[in-house]
UniProtKB/Swiss-Prot annotation:
Species per Swiss-Prot/TrEMBL record: Clostridium botulinum (strain Loch Maree / Type A3)
Family: Belongs to the UvrB family.
Protein name: UvrABC system protein B
Domain Helicase ATP-binding: 25-182
Species classification: Bacteria, Bacillati, Bacillota, Clostridia, Eubacteriales
Domain Helicase C-terminal: 429-595
C-alpha cells in the first residue's frame, strides 16, 4: 500500500508543528471532534496535509462550494503528487429540479446539463476508494446527496486478469448490465467496441486512456492500457477492474425485485389517491410510473431513476440514503473547511428538498419513495462520521461545544501581522475614505470597501468613479467565473477599489490589498457581527503594509471583541518575529489567468416581484414577511450577506406598504 507522503520545500513552522502534533494525537486517541482555529495566511491546508501524513487515514475534505473545493484539490495535489487526490462535486452545469406549482397547474420537468469532465472525476473518486487506501477526496456539500449503493457498485465491478478463462460475449453482457454502451464508431467514456478477438473498453473514470482486452479463444491473452487519441500502448497490465458507468447501476436480480416493489407501492398509492377523489392524479401516477418500469425492464435504467433509489437499494422507508460517505472505509478522517459556513449548509439541505417533493407526490408526479432520494439530514450526517476536524478562523458554537480538543494556529510562517485597526467617526466617512483610497493607490496597492446595503454600494461606486477612482462593484448577481475575472483584474491593477456587501467569499485573500474599510461598522447586526468583522479584517492579512478602518461613532461589542482578538494575534506574531528575527513580507502570489471552469447553476429566488409573491400567499402580507425573515436569518447564518441584506430591504418595503394600507 502507498503511504501518504507530503512533498514540499517547506517544513512546518510557527504554530504549525504544535497544531499538527495536537490534532494528530487527538485522532490517534480516538477523539471524534476536534477544531483547528487558523487565521488567514497561517497555512491551514499545509497543516491538514501534515496531519494526513501523520495519521495515514483515507480522508474527505468538505468545502462549502465548488470553487473553493477546486482550489483545495489543487493544493493537496501539489502536496501529495504520489497519492490519489480526487475531486467530487455536483456534475451539473445547469440544474432545474423537477417541481410542480399547484396554483398555476404547472409541472416543471427536471432539466439538467451534465459536465462530462466532472462526472469522470466523480467516478475516478469512487473507484479510487475501492482500489487503494491512500485517497484524499475534496468534495462540496453535494456529497451528502444519495449516490447509489456502494456494495452493489463493488459487486458489479468486472475484474479481469491475464490468463483468465472468460467468454468474450459474457464480458460484453456484463458491460451492458453495468450501463456501458456498445459504440464501434464514437468511442467515448462509458462505451466499448468489439473487433474480432479484441475488446476495447473506455472506463467511466478516464478521459484519455482506455483498456484493450485481447482474447485467444476463451482465454484473456493480453491486457493493455492505451492512449485513445494515438492508439499507442501506455502499459501492459496483469489485472484491471472495470467499475460501473453509473453509480445507480443495479444487477438484474435486484432490479426485478425492485420493480415488483415499485408496482406494489404504485398499486397502494393509486388506491389512496382514488379514495381521496384524486382521479386525475391517480391516472397520471400510473402512466408515469409504468413508463419508468418499462424503461427499467428494457435498458436497466430510466430518466430520474434516482427517485427509486430507496427501492433499488432495498432500504426501509425513511432510512438515510447511501452517499459518498458510505464509499469510505469506516476509519476515514473528515476535515470540514470553513466549518462556520459549511455546517449551516449541510443543516439546511434536506428541508428544502422535502418541500419541493411534497407537491410532486401529492399531485401524482412521483411515488412516495421519491422522498427518500434526498440529502442526509444533519443527524444522519453526524451518525455517518468517524473522526472530524473542523477548520475555521471563526468556528461557531457547535464546533467549539463538540470538540474535545482545539488547536490554534495564529503565527504565520511569513511573519505577517494581523492588520492594525483604526476606528474613525461616521461623520465625514466618505471624504475620509476618498483620502485614504488616494494614499493607498499612490503606494501601489488595492482597496476593499464593505457597505451595509446594495444601494449604498451602488451609490458609493458611482461617486468614486465620478471622482476619477477606478472602481468596481461586486454583487450577488455576478457568477463565479465573472467574479474570478474581477478579482484577477483587481490584482493586475485594471482597477483599484472593489466595493461590496459580502467580501467574505473564496478568492479574496489578495496580497495587493493594503486597505480594508468597513462603513457603518457600529450598526450591530448580521453584517457587522464578530464573525463577519474578524473574517473581513482577515482580507487585509496578506500584505505587510495593510490596515483596516472601521467607521463608527460607538464601539459595539462585536467591534470591541474583533479589535481585542486582532491585537492579541498581532502581539503573538510580533513576539515570534522578534524571537526568530523574522521581517514580515507581503505574500508573493502569481496572478494566474482565469481558469474557465463551469460552475454549478445556483438556484436563485427572485424577491423583487412582490405582487406574484403575495398572490401565492393569498395576499397575506404578514405570512410573507415571516417567510422572508426566516430566509434572511438563514442567509446571514450562512454568511450570504448580499442575499440577507436584499431580503432585509424587501421586508422593509413590505412593512412600509402594510403601514400605507392601514
Amino acid at each position: 500500500m502507498n503511504q501518504f507522503k507530503v512533498i514540499s520545500k517547506f517544513n512546518p513552522t510557527g504554530d504549525q508543528p504544535k497544531a499538527i502534533k495536537s490534532i494528530a494525537k487527538g485522532i490517534e486517541k480516538g477523539e471524534k471532534f476536534q477544531t483547528l482555529i487558523g487565521v488567514t495566511g497561517s497555512g491551514k491546508t499545509f497543516t491538514m496535509a501534515n496531519i494526513i501524513e501523520k495519521v495515514q487515514k483515507p480522508t474527505l475534505v468538505l468545502a462549502h462550494n465548488k470553487t473553493l473545493a477546486a482550489q483545495l484539490c489543487s493544493e493537496f495535489r501539489e502536496f501529495f503528487p504520489n497519492n490519489a487526490v480526487e475531486y467530487f462535486v455536483s456534475y451539473y452545469d445547469y440544474y432545474q429540479p423537477e417541481a410542480y406549482v399547484a396554483q398555476s397547474d404547472t409541472y416543471i420537468e427536471k432539466d439538467a446539463s451534465i459536465n462530462d469532465e466532472i462526472d469522470k472525476l466523480r467516478h475516478s473518486a469512487t473507484s479510487a476508494l475501492f482500489e487503494r487506501k491512500d485517497v484524499i477526496i475534496v468534495a462540496s456539500v453535494s456529497c451528502i446527496y444519495g449516490l447509489g449503493n456502494p456494495e452493489e457498485y463493488k459487486k458489479l465491478t468486472i475484474s479481469l486478469r491475464e490468463g483468465m478463462e472468460k467468454d468474450r460475449d459474457e464480458i460484453i453482457k456484463k458491460l451492458v448490465e453495468i450501463q456501458y454502451e456498445r459504440n464501434d464508431i464514437d468511442f467515448s467514456r462509458g462505451t466499448f467496441r468489439v473487433k474480432g478477438d479484441v475488446l476495447d473498453i473506455f472506463p467511466a473514470s478516464s478521459s484519455s486512456k482506455a483498456v484493450r482486452i485481447e482474447f485467444f479463444g476463451d482465454e484473456i491473452d493480453r491486457i493493455k492500457e492505451f492512449d485513445v487519441l494515438t492508439g499507442e500502448t501506455i502499459t501492459k497490465l496483469k489485472h484491471i477492474s472495470i467499475f460501473p458507468a453509473s453509480h445507480f447501476a443495479t444487477s438484474k436480480d435486484r432490479l426485478e425485485i425492485a420493480i415488483k416493489n415499485i408496482e406494489e407501492e404504485l398499486e397502494e398509492r393509486v388506491k389512496e389517491l382514488v379514495s381521496q377523489d384524486k382521479i386525475l392524479e391517480a391516472q397520471r401516477l400510473k402512466q408515469r410510473t409504468n413508463f419508468d418500469i418499462e424503461m427499467m425492464r428494457e435498458v436497466g435504467y430510466c430518466t430520474g431513476i434516482e427517485n427509486y433509489s430507496r427501492v433499488l437499494d432495498g432500504r426501509a422507508k425513511g432510512t438515510p440514503p447511501q452517499t459518498l460517505l458510505d464509499y469510505f472505509p469506516q476509519d476515514f478522517l473528515l476535515f470540514i473547511d470553513e466549518s462556520h459556513v459549511t455546517l449551516p449548509q449541510v443543516k439546511a439541505m434536506q428541508a428544502g428538498d422535502k418541500s419541493r417533493k411534497d407537491s410532486l407526490v401529492e399531485y401524482g408526479f412521483r411515488l412516495p419513495c421519491a422522498y427518500d432520494n434526498r440529502p442526509l439530514t444533519f443527524k444522519e450526517f453526524e451518525n455517518k462520521l468517524n473522526q472530524v476536524v473542523f477548520v475555521s478562523a471563526t468556528p461557531a458554537k457547535y464546533e467549539l461545544e463538540y470538540s474535545a480538543n482545539t488547536a490554534e494556529q495564529v503565527i504565520r510562517p511569513t511573519g505577517l501581522l494581523d492588520p492594525e485597526i483604526i476606528v474613525k467617526p461616521v461623520k465625514g466617512q466618505i471624504d475620509d475614505l476618498y483620502t485614504s483610497i488616494q494614499e493607498t493607490i499612490k503606494r501601489g496597492f488595492r482597496i476593499l470597501v464593505t457597505t451595509l446595503t446594495k444601494k449604498m454600494a451602488e451609490d458609493l461606486t458611482d461617486y468614486l468613479k465620478e471622482m476619477g477612482v477606478k472602481t468596481r462593484y461586486l454583487h450577488s448577481d455576478i457568477d463565479t467565473i465573472e467574479r474570478m475575472k474581477i478579482i484577477h483584474d483587481l490584482r493586475k491593477g485594471e482597477f483599484h477599489v472593489l466595493v461590496g456587501i459580502n467580501l467574505l467569499r473564496e478568492g479574496l485573500d489578495i496580497p495587493e490589498v493594503a486597505l480594508v474599510t468597513i462603513l457603518d461598522a457600529d450598526k450591530e447586526g448580521f453584517l457587522r457581527s464578530e464573525t463577519s468583522l474578524i473574517q473581513t479584517v482577515g482580507r487585509a492579512a496578506r500584505n505587510s503594509e495593510s490596515k483596516v478602518i472601521m467607521y463608527g461613532d460607538v464601539i459595539t461589542k462585536s467591534m470591541e471583541k474583533t479589535i481585542r482578538e486582532t491585537n492579541r494575534r498581532r502581539k503573538i506574531q510580533m513576539e515570534h518575529n522578534e524571537k526568530h528575527g523574522i521581517v514580515p513580507k507581503t505574500i508573493i502570489k502569481d496572478i494566474r489567468e482565469v481558469i474557465q471552469i463551469s460552475d454549478i447553476a445556483e438556484e436563485r429566488k427572485e424577491y423583487d416581484n412582490l405582487n406574484e409573491a403575495l398572490k401565492s400567499y393569498n395576499n397575506d402580507i404578514d405570512k410573507l414577511i415571516e417567510k422572508y425573515e426566516e430566509e434572511m436569518k438563514e442567509a446571514a447564518q450562512n454568511l450570504q450577506f448580499e442575499k440577507a441584506a436584499h431580503l432585509r430591504d424587501v421586508i422593509y418595503k413590505l412593512k412600509r406598504d402594510k403601514e400605507t394600507e392601514l
